[in-house]
């Protein structure tokens, strides 16, 4: 529309005197502004309707290897997380807040991985690695939502562990349904709200011409890197929102495990101290990897958003961590292992792989 208006305007016969008077009085500022608007609107004609995902490599042999590798990871992720949920549902002895948190974490991890991995597997088998605009919007929203929810669930689980170890006699009272259910619901609500803010802010930007995302899935930093609009506000939103969520949840985790450490030191049983140290150490390792990669990806200068190293780092918090969480939080737990043996013990393959026992 702007271009047609411009053509109709410049085709009107204008006398030299009128033009000279106009430029003299206005210093031709209007024409410069109008030219800028015209150029902007002409560039907007090529609005992006799909995005190209860069992927790991164009080598067909490597793509085949990556396909089977990530397919195996995805299947084990689903089996581990969905298996844990099934165990918690079926075993009445696991109907406790701690295991409800674990089952919620497993559901988030299964969904988180399912948002990213299937599309990535399809890209390994096709030459054109593309995703539609709406598909990219959905992937950003869901990934951000599940990622944020996991941050809050990890903090809630750390607090739950503190209550269970510091004062086990009052655990059922301190973590009653009136306490743990709001914590779980608040985690999901926070994830949805946080994802909504960033999704709306990101896709309110203009994407013209450049549409190659240097990642294996749609994510906010690489989208900001290719946007035609000013992304300063988006970068501030990303820095302050993600930074605040990370800071609050990390503090809760550190304070909870710090108090757990004090409680451990008061234990008289050396064997009890060793078991709790081992379990808490594994938990902190998983939490550190997850929070560390999130901080690296989102709370940093925007000039390095398109780094190729980001592709590797993003795999950890979207694909590797959902695979490791069932092992870190569940298979090291005696109650969960006993329950899984009852349910899957007759299966010789599972019995040998997970429990290292012979029939």
Curated annotation (Swiss-Prot):
Residues 86-93, 160-178, 257-276, 332-359 are cytoplasmic. Signal peptide: none annotated. GO terms for cellular component: plasma membrane. The keyword Transmembrane applies. InterPro entries: GPCR_Rhodpsn, GPCR_Rhodpsn_7TM, Olfact_rcpt. GO terms for molecular function: G protein-coupled receptor activity; odorant binding; olfactory receptor activity. Glycans are attached at residue 44. Pfam families: 7tm_4 (PF13853). The chain crosses the membrane at residues 65-85, 94-114, 139-159, 179-199, 236-256, 277-297, 311-331. The keyword Transmembrane helix applies. It comes from the Eukaryota. It is found in: Cell membrane. It is a multi-pass membrane protein. GO terms for biological process: G protein-coupled receptor signaling pathway; sensory perception of smell. Keywords: Cell membrane, G-protein coupled receptor, Glycoprotein, Membrane, Olfaction, Receptor, Sensory transduction, Transducer, Transmembrane, Transmembrane helix. SUPFAM superfamilies: Family A G protein-coupled receptor-like. PANTHER family: OLFACTORY RECEPTOR (PTHR48018). Odorant receptor. Belongs to the G-protein coupled receptor 1 family. This is Olfactory receptor 5T2.
